[in-house]
Amino acid sequence: MKRQKIIFLNLYILSVFCFPATTVFAQEAALMPNIVIILADDMGYGDVSGLNIHARTHTPNIDQMIKKGVNFTDAHSGGAVCTPSRYGLITGRYYFRAEKKFDYLGYLKPLIDRNRETIGSLMQKAGYETACVGKWHLGLDWGLKSPDKPQIPLGDDKRSTNTDFTKSVTGGPNALGFDYSYILPASLDMPPYVFIENNRVIDPDIIFTADAYPRTLQSTKPVWDRKYTNADDIYWERGIWWRNGEMSRSFKMEGCFDTIVAKGLSFIAAHVTREPKQPFMLYLSLTGPHTPWLADKVFVGTSPLGSYGDFILEVDDAVQQVNAMLQRLDISDNTMVVFASDNGAGWAEDDIQVYNHKCNAGRRGQKGDIYDGGHHVPLIITWPSKIKKPFTVKSTMSLVDLMATFAEMT
């Protein structure tokens, strides 16, 4: 119990250090900070140039957050892969408590009970407008073409499912305290490749990815990623691959990241115009630098780390776009921006040898591992009106603790 209390105090060091509890926790909702959570996907601690003096990446905008805010040097995600980490962030609980575990890729059933408190419902009750934009990967209830048949067919061919994309998709963010949602069901290498806005698939005209993209390129080398096993999938080069499967006809793999960032910015601008006195919380869940490493053409070829490094630059640019929008709307002073990653980078020893870059800052393990490199993540928080000087917190904490921290503020 004593150890738990010590950990609890460490979790709230930001609140205690930055401002008097008696003056802030009693504020009216109109004076509470806006909150933007930017969650990178598979970005290692060592990918942030401000955290790794040997980094071959360049992240000037994330580095600026370090220079202006709180840098947690011993932060950990709730898991070493996507779903457990996101479950912990959204619910404030560790993933082993979830009744249901992994299912099939983007067709995962909802993992979070509708009656459970989440960061969305918590902040809703505190008077916030809440939004979830980007990668979800916590399960959804899909409508079926034939209710008496399983959604995923038996056998090896799981490309064509029993999913009716014209029907409402429930059990997601809107059922869990988010007023607005614009999501990708799972990772950008997992079908179905569709955008869902407030429970409706944007484009229900479904094709297969292999109908729109060549499985290989003329330049593709016959040396596949170690985890790549299915010759039916799309594979262009190291890190640029995704599973074949159902996809909206209008969906563009190479434009997904930009669409998510644009939707997040649009939510902020629309909210401030519509309800300037109401605080908002945006959970902006990016798809990069998770595979496929498909950076915008503006960034292609600009990094010494190949496609992966190009994608890191685009992630950093997304941070810049968010902060620029907050400044343009004159709300940056009272907006808390949280930047983190859902787990360590998937960066094998071969990659380290080829690029001379340690995504996970030399720590043992990588994404998917129980070792430190699998879950030791960057965590940086800025809040200009309250955090006047940058400082570093060396105490151990977890992204799971963010929900409790927000609860303490409301």
Identify the role of each PLM range.
Residues 5-10, 35:
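Terminal low-complexity, poorly structured segments
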Residues 8-21:
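Bacterial N-terminal signal peptides
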Residues 23-410:
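Formylglycine-dependent sulfatase
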Residues 1-5, 27:
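Positively charged n-region of N-terminal signal peptides that target proteins for export
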